[in-house]
Amino acid sequence: MLTDILKKIFGSQNERILKRIAPLVDEINSYEPVMRKLSDAALKAKTPEFKQRIANGEPLDDLLPEAFAVAREGAVRTLGMRPFDVQMIGGIVLHEGMIAEMKTGEGKTLVAVMPIYLNALTGRGVHLVTVNDYLARRDSEWMGQVYKFLGLSVGCIVHGLDDPERKEAYGADVTYGTNNEYGFDYLRDNMKFRIEDMVQRELNYAIVDEVDSILIDEARTPLIISGPAEKSTALYYNINRIIPQLKPETHYTKEEKSRTVALTEDGVTRTEKLLGVDNLYDPRQIDILHHVQQALRAHVLFKRDVDYIVKDGKVIIVDEFTGRLMPGRRYSEGLHQALEAKENVHIENENQTLASITFQNYFRMFDKLAGMTGTAETEAAEFAKIYKLEVVVIPTHRKMIREDYADCIYRTEAEKFRAVAEEIKEAYAVKRPVLVGTVNIAKSEKLSGILKRQGVPHQVLNAKHHEKEAEIVALAGQPGAVTISTNMAGRGTDIVLGPGVVDVGGLHIIGTERHEARRIDNQLRGRSGRQGDPGSSRFYLSLEDDLMRIFAADRLSGLMQRIGMKEDEPIEHRLITKAIENAQSKVEAQNFSIRKQLLEYDDVMNQQREVIYRQRREALQGENLKPVVLDMIEDLLEGILAETADEKHYAEDWDLEKINSEVLRLFGLQMNLTVESLGDIEYEEFRDSLLERLTKRYEAREQEFGESMMRELESYLLLQTVDTYWKDHLLNMDHLKEGIGLRGYGQQDPLIAYKREGHALFDEMIERIKEETIRLLFHIQIQREEQLDELRKEQEDQPMFFGPAEGAGQKPQTRKDRKVGRNDPCPCGSGKKYKKCCGK
């Protein structure tokens, strides 16, 4: 009530932003006659002039009106397209680091040109992020004409480019590419062994196209680079063989909401008998139990042609949001191998995580982030909370006149599809184009089969036919066109109405199921009614749809019985519509909670990732690691003495045997210390003499290898050790996260426990990195300098896989190594105490 009163007095936040921007648009328009009179050469000369003004300290905001006017004139001269005033508003919103919500067909691609041009003038680079390679390539070529005309360089990052090509594309003023390519390049860069091999530059400014799809839908799946872990494939086949002999409810229970399957007590007994194992919960068999559960998930929860397809003898994941295939992406924790065993195709080795990051944390690293989409308002709270991004709804250029009809609800899926086919036939009879949205490949092919039998010509657009995606979508507005599309495949391609289509009512949209998120339903509707065109939309639902069955079944079944539904008879009832909306709100809240939790846990990893990547980069950039190595030697000696000697006592009380063995193990130095040889030496003198001998040993190694080779060796060994232990640490953190939820039963906050124990694991890893680097440095035998290059090449050429494949493999062995003390020098070599540096 109060909110409504305040809105009437002050206007909504959205209205206030638009009111503030309006004078800027007038100022841009005032430059238009001036720009129009300029010759091509004079217009192009504006770019170096702007760059000079920026170098002289003029802020971008002061340049905005004139720069936007130049970019607009550039678009007119190269593309023959003049951005409307509402597109200028969208451009200003993007420049200010907000999300511009613009309806389908309002020209989002062109909107980005103005803020990209302005921000690229700084020379620090601008990233435009799209959902697929096709759009990245298309937009970089199409809009690239404007930038090139105005004297800026354009790069495009797509799958299949080699490193030099990627580096060149990232070095351009404007870079187009997909979220996956950007994220994986960031991870790959932080696995490189030479600074000059890195391809990305600083993360300055990014505009994310289809921002809801990238920052919300895909945020639940972290980007992961993994490498092969040793495991026998026979295990997967053996376990797969027994799964059909387990019965639902008797031997296992499933929870579709959380996508989990659990063995019952009878199930455990039956599995032990079938596999010939005494006790599945024996620590030595825990690995088998894990793989039984993954095989159950593969058989019970993952459906062929819905979650994955089998193509050319490979199991390929289908993106649940876009319906596109994701070749090269693999499920983690042995699930992908379980699916391969289920489908009886070749099992590829299990993978272990080498590097991982979430989209949330990758995009939050940009100095400035903005986005655009047709549907963001329903998720405005999430954008504000996680990314600190405000959503601004941009007015349409022409009034929207599409008609959205009420949902039609049927009892069964078969009845629903019959009704959908009937409506398609009616539209086809009058040559009215229809776009039908389905939730997965299986449903689109089922509907396609019905239409074939009824003699209705149509096109199917799903992950199996993605090559023709843009072409099929572009023709979806032609007279009599019938297009069946999974989810939001084809986003970014305009559906232009063909001749005579306006007269028969424009493009008609049919949704065959409600999506988990209202936003996705709105995206489907938004394909019709672009730029004031006529159009309509209707959703057909059944009580057998996943959303209804899982989230609204209890309320709806009783309601339906009271209403009394008959076969092939639809029902429209406000209570049912309300129940559906409640179900969608429930799922949206659940998904937001999952994403928020993922981020909270990844934030712990993110702090550790930043420390490791920063140290790696310093090691790559550092001309001389000698001071760092000498500090490590001193730290390790302090660690040995802390456990074996006491400054208050004399040699007869010290553990000289352990000092001898540890110095030999780590530094390769035979000490042969005895109580007799040490006499009455005091602790300080003893420590200093030991350090002096170790320093001399180090200098002898340096003389043996030569100064230049020693520096190379130090850099290589530190990087190689960091990578090895970071990989193991990721695996440890994965296993910690898996079991941490159970702490809730012990009245512990799982997140706090994860932070505390994750930090302890990180401390332990840092100590092990120091130990291993020094041990290798004092023991390694290098005959010639080329050996180092060969070792480095071998390390760089390790096989990698990209996708949702978090670490798997054997549980790590726990070690009782000494942890880095809070007051110890920081292992990164900064010279500060650990608690003041990496241990913060």
Swiss-Prot record:
- Superkingdom classification of source: Bacteria
Reactions that this protein is recorded to catalyse: ATP + H2O + cellular proteinSide 1 = ADP + phosphate + cellular proteinSide 2
User: Which Pfam families does the record cross-reference, listed alphabetically?
Assistant: P-loop_SecA, SEC-C, SecA_DEAD, SecA_PP_bind, SecA_SW
The protein's required cofactor(s) are namely: Zn(2+)
Tell me the SUPFAM superfamilies matching this sequence.
Helical scaffold and wing domains of SecA (SSF81886), P-loop containing nucleoside triphosphate hydrolases (SSF52540), Pre-protein crosslinking domain of SecA (SSF81767)
Instruction: Classify the main location.
Output: membrane
**Disordered as annotated region, ranges:** 791-840
How does this chain sit within the bilayer? Answer: Peripheral membrane protein
This entry's comment on the bound cofactor is: May bind 1 zinc ion per subunit.
* Localization of this protein: Cell inner membrane; Cytoplasm
Q: GO molecular function of the protein, one example?
A: ATP binding
| Residues binding Zn(2+) | 826, 828, 837-838
Please state the Enzyme Commission number of this protein: 7.4.2.8
Q: Per the UniProt entry, what are the Gene Ontology biological process annotations, in alphabetical order?
A: intracellular protein transmembrane transport; protein import; protein targeting; protein transport by the Sec complex
InterPro entries attached here? Helicase_ATP-bd (IPR014001), Helicase_C-like (IPR001650), P-loop_NTPase (IPR027417), SEC_C_motif (IPR004027), SecA (IPR000185), SecA_CS (IPR020937), SecA_DEAD (IPR011115), SecA_motor_DEAD (IPR014018)
Which HAMAP family does the annotation name? SecA (MF_01382)
From the Swiss-Prot or TrEMBL record, give the protein name.
Protein translocase subunit SecA
> What is the phylogenetic placement of the source species in the record?
Bacteria, Pseudomonadati, Thermodesulfobacteriota, Syntrophobacteria, Syntrophobacterales
Q: Per UniProt, what is the name of the gene that codes for the protein in this document? A: secA
